[in-house]
């Protein structure tokens, strides 16, 4: 019937907006992760070749999924200021798939990547992507690209808090 897909309450709207990692998402630091799966081993090897440490994997909650288009991708979750998942991206490890990054269906301008770790009163380092972010010291976030829009939540918070910023973009930006 025509109206059967309409939302019946405000709680339903919130559920629809909730961001969820892939159902089989597993953290690399989870002892139960299936390291016997060759694709999971390849993702782990890729991370190690990129210079990621076990501490990085724990701190940034790197994970993996073997279903829903995320096979052979490292998944980077992001959390808002309250610790709720607000975004995730899955980076292809082979370099031959399009898109290179498979993102959650979220408007990137309406979230701040890993805001949970940001102190708006201190200098904030802005980098392009999650791998760049891992190599930063404390108080950094990534743009998920090379552009900061004036109407993005990140830009508005920087202005609101008068946060000093340090740009560390790739040479091709």
Segments from the language model and where they lie:
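Non-catalytic accessory segments of DNA primases and related replication-initiation nucleases
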Residues: 1-55, 59-64, 68-73, 84-85, ...
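Phosphate-handling DNA/RNA-contact segment within nucleic-acid enzymes
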Residues: 67-163
């Amino acid at each position: 019937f025509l109206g059967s897909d309409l939302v019946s309450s405000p709680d339903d709207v919130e559920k629809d907006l909730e961001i969820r990692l892939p159902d089989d998402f597993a953290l690399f630091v989870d002892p139960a992760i299936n390291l016997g799966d060759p694709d999971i081993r390849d993702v782990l090897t890729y991370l190690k070749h990129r210079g990621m440490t076990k501490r990085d994997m724990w701190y940034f909650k790197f994970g993996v999924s073997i279903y829903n288009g995320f096979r052979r991708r490292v998944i980077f979750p992001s959390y808002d200021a309250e610790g709720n998942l607000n975004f995730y991206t899955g980076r292809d490890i082979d370099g031959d798939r399009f898109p290179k990054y498979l993102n959650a269906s979220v408007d990137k301008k309406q979230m701040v990547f890993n805001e949970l770790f940001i102190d708006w009163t201190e200098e904030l380092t802005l980098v392009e992507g999650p791998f760049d972010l891992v190599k930063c010291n404390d108080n950094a976030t990534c743009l998920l690209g090379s552009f900061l829009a004036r109407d993005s939540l990140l830009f508005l918070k920087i202005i609101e808090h008068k946060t000093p910023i340090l740009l560390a973009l790739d040479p091709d930006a």
